[in-house]
Amino acid sequence: MSSQKIRIRLKAFDHKTLDQSAEKIVETAKRTGARVSGPIPLPTEKSIYTILRSPHVNKDSREQFEMRTHKRLIDILEPTSKTVDALMRLDLPAGVDIEIKL
């Protein structure tokens, strides 16, 4: 398994939970003997939604909301079978989206 590389992409709306999850993954991988590159911060996506404040008139009165999606990238180089097992058992918060590629 040493010739493979595991790439983990994390996404979340809250950057604090995202960083805590990334630290948990890095710590688990290092503890099982794998080399880790990251967490690398990727660009933050910012979605802006503009809506009318009034349901009827006053077109000039609008309100804007934004939603930021923070992302991190972690590469696990030279993973062992213990690393994969430990990552599968890892418990992460519900607000963090994880995408794993081998």
UniProtKB/Swiss-Prot annotation:
Superkingdom of origin: Bacteria
UniProt signal peptide: none
Listed GO MF terms: structural constituent of ribosome; tRNA binding
Keywords of this entry: Ribonucleoprotein, Ribosomal protein
Any one Gene Ontology cellular component term annotated for this protein: ribosome
UniProt function note: Involved in the binding of tRNA to the ribosomes.
Subunit structure: Part of the 30S ribosomal subunit.
Name of the protein in its database record: Small ribosomal subunit protein uS10
Source species: Desulfitobacterium hafniense (strain Y51)
